[in-house]
Amino acid sequence: MRMRNLLLVLGLCLVTTISYSKRSSAELRRFEHTPTTKGNDGGSVSFLVIGDWGRRGQFNQSLVALQMGVVGENLDIDFVVSTGDNFYDNGLIGEHDVAFEESFTNVYTANSLQKQWYTGKGDAEAQLSPLLRKIDSRWLCLRSFVVNAAELAELFFVDTTPFVEMYFTNTEKHTYDWRGVTSPKVYTANLLKDLETALKESRAKWKIVIGHHAIRSIGHHGDTQELVDKLLPILQANNVDFYMNGHDHCLEHISDPKSPIQFLTSGAGSKAWRGDVKKKNREGLNFFYDGQGFMSVQLTQTESTIVFYDVFGQVLHRWDVSKQLHLAI
């Protein structure tokens, strides 16, 4: 009964923009998002990506939000993606925590940002309650799920926190939410299996996997070895185009030398770490910025454009990729 009520609440809240459909695997819930059709090119999808932001407007969070609103309007975005660590320092203490409104509702006020927010879970948070949608209907945060944007793009959100082994041995700095994770090994094994199944079944032109922790990064935390060992091989084997993450408070673009995967870090939504850069393993590095900012993504059937912006809305880095259009006969 409890699960039925949960799905009912989600279904009622998402009816205007997305709809719930049957799971493609045992654990990954699936949502259908119908983007606005633009032009006569078969449609397109545009969205912004922001991470590590929730500080009640401080540390330039409000300035980043302002520029997100400007870019969002110019691109006529369909939705916003958050890569996690949404409320500092240790997430929300409950559904009625004022930090939700002070760090989200009252900060991202631009008209262009009044769209669906698909939100990944950070490493020290508890904001999964569907009751939060009664406060702000834009909010959707689950551990792991799939968003299908008109079969042009599929976004696979992965809860990466249980992969990080030190979180189970060093709990002094943060309070971790392990509800539903009785055994990390079993949980991550099942999640990887479900993700692999969903990726194999996907017919989307663009496959995008989103997690909080970086696979590749030269920022403060660097590479997440557990993800390099366990998650990356699945992405490489299933033609994933982009892996997007936060965790490191910077903006980054690194190319995978063994596949077409682009590693994109957007974790600069508020407090950034100036000068905190690792000198080792810079293979494939295209761009790094240690200030605040965000990222935009534009997708069509044949083209993708990734743009990084700073706190003033200035373009820092742009990456364009083309794909052939294969027509069914």
Residue positions per predicted region:
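Cleavable N-terminal signal peptides of Sec/SRP-targeted secreted and luminal proteins
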Residues: 4-19
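N-terminal active-site segment of His-dependent metallophosphoesterases
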Residues: 20-99
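Extended active-site neighborhood of metal-dependent phosphoesterases/phosphodiesterases
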Residues: 29-35, 88-205, 222, 226-242, ...
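Generic enzyme active-site microenvironment
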Residues: 50, 83, 120, 210, ...
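Short, well-ordered beta-to-alpha junction loops that form the rim of enzyme active sites
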Residues: 160, 210-214, 247-248, 309-310
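Short acidic, glycine-rich surface-loop motifs adjacent to enzyme active sites
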Residues: 202-219
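A short C-terminal boundary segment appended to hydrolase-like catalytic domains
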Residues: 285-329
